[in-house]
């Protein structure tokens, strides 16, 4: 509640001995510039104005700048972390300039994950495993 501090970021993930939820709940939602506080996350889920986590925000900006139409498309998000996977899946499904997409969330335990990826119009890999998605897994575009 220090008026001299405008905002701050809790660098996630935290070490295992630190209770991440306890830390996130201690954040003043008005100063949570990463959008991880449950209040801000809830606002994002309701498509209300709030801070958006940095990486999902960057993905949305890339889609805008490259004029990639997402409306009515099938998006597969690989990863379900509250840092990238869940927020981007919410944003891609929300109404807006970038969004209005049908979203499937896959993860490391999804059986036959390749079959989901091959059906997708847009694939967002947030699994944290470099090179996980291979060229032959992507749907061919005519």
Name the predicted role of every residue range:
Residues 9-75, 113-116:
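Anion-binding alpha/beta catalytic cores of soluble intermediary-metabolism enzymes, centered on
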Residues 1-4:
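An N-terminal-biased, well-structured beta-alpha scaffold segment characteristic
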Residues 49-141:
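Glycine-rich phosphate/diphosphate-binding loop of Rossmann-like nucleotide-binding domains
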Residues 8, 141-142:
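Cationic, amphipathic, low-complexity alpha-helical segments enriched
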């Amino acid at each position: 509640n220090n008026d001299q501090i405008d905002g701050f970021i809790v660098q996630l993930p935290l070490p295992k001995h630190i209770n991440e939820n306890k830390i996130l709940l201690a954040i003043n939602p008005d100063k949570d510039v990463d959008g991880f506080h449950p209040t801000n996350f809830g606002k994002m889920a309701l498509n209300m104005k709030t801070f958006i986590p940095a990486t999902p925000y960057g993905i949305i900006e890339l889609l805008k700048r490259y004029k990639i139409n997402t409306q009515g498309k099938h998006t597969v998000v690989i990863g379900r972390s509250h840092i990238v996977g869940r927020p981007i899946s919410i944003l891609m499904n929300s109404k807006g300039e970038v969004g209005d997409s049908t979203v499937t969330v896959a993860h490391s335990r999804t059986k036959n994950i390749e079959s989901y990826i091959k059906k997708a119009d847009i694939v967002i890999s947030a699994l944290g495993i470099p090179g996980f998605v291979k060229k032959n897994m992507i749907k061919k575009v005519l």
